């Protein structure tokens, strides 16, 4: 099993982890109902995806 030769300092550890933060997901605008939704998914308010009705949504 591999064992590190020397101890890594807290600064070195934190520099390595500086890229581990979660990215905020962007929002797209639905072309049918103009509501915000997550890209590459069906719009939750109207049920359209790429201009086509995919699911029926009760209002």
UniProtKB/Swiss-Prot annotation:
Region (Disordered): 1-20
Keyword tRNA processing among record annotations: no
GO BP, sorted A to Z: translation
Keywords (A to Z) from UniProt: Ribonucleoprotein, Ribosomal protein
Transmembrane segments: none
InterPro entries from the UniProt entry: Ribosomal_bL32 (IPR002677), Ribosomal_bL32_bact (IPR044957), Ribosomal_zn-bd (IPR011332)
SUPFAM superfamilies in the cross-refs: Zn-binding ribosomal proteins (SSF57829)
GO cellular component: cytosolic large ribosomal subunit
Keyword Transferase: no
GO MF assignments: structural constituent of ribosome
Family, per entry: Belongs to the bacterial ribosomal protein bL32 family.
Protein's name in the database: Large ribosomal subunit protein bL32
UniProt organism field: Chlamydia trachomatis serovar D (strain ATCC VR-885 / DSM 19411 / UW-3/Cx)
Gene expressing this chain: rpmF
């Amino acid at each position: 099993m591999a064992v590190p030769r020397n101890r890594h300092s807290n600064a070195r550890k934190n520099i390595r982890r500086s890229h581990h933060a979660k990215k905020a997901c962007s929002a797209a605008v639905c072309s049918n109902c103009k509501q915000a939704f997550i890209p590459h998914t069906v719009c939750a308010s109207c049920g359209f995806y790429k201009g086509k009705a995919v699911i029926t949504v009760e209002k």
